[in-house]
């Protein structure tokens, strides 16, 4: 493939997962390989008044493993999942230890 002069390369170097099948890349991949479903009865709220009684809920997630309590209280649950997955991807990429990192050249995509 020939790249044009104004095109930039994108490199995926780290992964993070918070999902109904696992809260880490290793756990999610293992469950996917073993055919484990993340779908089950709704437990996060009273589903008696909605048509569907099943969903893919994230289990055993603790935002306090990622941010302090005060910060977590200002985040919606879906934002907590995104922040946690992003932080895991950053760590997986080895960027924690990269002191010479040009932050203008790095991003986390969700």
Question: What do these predicted ranges mean?
Answer:
Residues 1-110:
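Conserved "HGTGT" condensation-loop signature of ketosynthase/thiolase-family condensing enzymes
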């Amino acid at each position: 493939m020939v790249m044009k002069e104004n095109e930039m390369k994108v490199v995926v170097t780290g992964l993070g997962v918070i999902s109904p099948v696992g809260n880490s890349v290793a756990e999610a991949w293992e469950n996917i390989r073993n055919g484990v479903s993340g779908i089950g009865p709704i437990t996060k709220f009273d589903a008696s008044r909605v048509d569907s009684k099943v969903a893919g809920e994230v289990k055993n997630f603790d935002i306090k493993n990622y941010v302090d309590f005060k910060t977590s209280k200002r985040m919606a649950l879906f934002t907590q999942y995104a922040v946690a997955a992003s932080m895991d991807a950053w760590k997986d990429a080895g960027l924690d230890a990269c002191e010479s990192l040009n932050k203008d050249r790095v991003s986390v995509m969700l």
